[in-house]
Design a protein with these regions (language model features):
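Short acidic capping loops at alpha-helix termini that bridge into adjacent secondary structure
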Residues: 126-129
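Pyridoxal 5′-phosphate
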Residues: 132-136
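Positively charged, low-complexity, intrinsically disordered RNA-binding extensions
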Residues: 140-144
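C-terminal edge-of-domain segments
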Residues: 145-160
Length: 160
């Protein structure tokens, strides 16, 4: 029997002035950015948590604690590289990743393909194995009033 594992990740960050908005390693021009210890890339964080969950590696808070100064301002793609190395060491291959960004603004559709390409490159998979979507919550809740952004991600891993 093939050993397959499904993982789910969720992340949320507050939007604030004076920070860059980075999603999937792409800097999005906007007047607000996500607040966090690293670059606060909510998309990449959700993807990492999905991958960690599927491989039983815990979560990114365990692997990259916000109390550790080594991770202050770090690119989340660099953290994803470290997760990808742990997956490889554990004998796991990424079958696919699917993520849904939740935000009222800005519109990220024009940058989706670049985000997918960045994530796929770090994970060492073809771009057709990574999908990024975006939706709003119709002005409801903290994402709807642009107080923050959220992201859900799922992945499928296969034991090599």
């Amino acid at each position: 029997m093939t050993d397959l594992r499904i993982g789910h990740g969720y992340d949320v960050h507050r939007l604030t002035e004076g920070r860059r908005l980075v999603l999937g390693g792409v800097e999005i021009p906007w007047d607000l950015g996500l607040l966090g210890h690293s670059d606060a890339d909510v998309l990449t964080h959700a993807v990492m948590d999905a991958l960690c969950g599927a491989a039983k590696l815990g979560d990114i808070g365990k692997l990259f604690p916000d109390s550790d100064p080594r991770y202050a301002g770090i690119s989340s793609l660099e953290l994803l590289r470290q997760v990808a190395a742990l997956l490889k060491k554990g004998g796991w291959a990424v079958v696919n990743v699917d993520a849904t960004l939740i935000a009222q603004a800005p519109k990220v559709g024009p940058c989706r393909r670049e985000m997918e390409a960045n994530l796929a490159a770090v994970l060492g998979v073809e771009t057709d194995r990574v999908n990024v979507k975006a939706t709003t919550e119709e002005h409801l809740g903290f994402t709807g009033d642009s107080s923050g952004m959220a992201c859900h991600a799922v992945c499928l891993l296969m034991r090599l």
